[in-house]
Amino acid sequence: MNKDDNTTILTEPIVKFFRGKNFGFLGTVNKDGSPQVTPTWIDIIEKEENKDGHEKIILINTARDRLKQKNVSRDPRVSISMVDEDNPYSMVTIKGRVVEQTTDGADEHIDKLAKRYLSADRYPAHSPTIKRIILKVKPEKIFYLPPRYTDYLQKLNKK
């Protein structure tokens, strides 16, 4: 591995993880300091940045008052791990912070994720009693293990 495999920039090969049906495993910190990990649907957007151009922000849609939302409200540090659905040896781990929580567009966003992950036009578990919320994560450190290091392992696995 080389220094290019550790970055703070979501490069195109890393962004591809967010385009498929790859689950993100979101790690947050519980009140007692222990880790809490949740598999979750995950998304990415480009955000306008005033002087540095564009920055990519990771979106996680959850329900208000779920444990992960409570945890990031108290401690915004998160870790996200993803593996490529086509090559589970290719992976990315992202450390970052939740920089914003918003309900704006959260219902529409969960429908968008349902389309990608379930091929459904609408999220099947919509409920008027559950308020959706989007967690916006700014990456601070990224580790990427690209296919050039993992193709051999994948070939061995298919034998």
Regions inferred by a protein language model and the residue ranges of each:
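A short beta-turn/loop motif at secondary-structure boundaries
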Residues: D32-S34, D84-P88, S127-T129
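Short helix-to-loop capping/linker segments positioned immediately adjacent to catalytic or ligand/cofactor-binding
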Residues: P13, F25-K31, A120-H126
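Solvent-exposed residues in well-ordered beta-strands and their adjoining turns
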Residues: I45, A63, V83, V99-Q101, ...
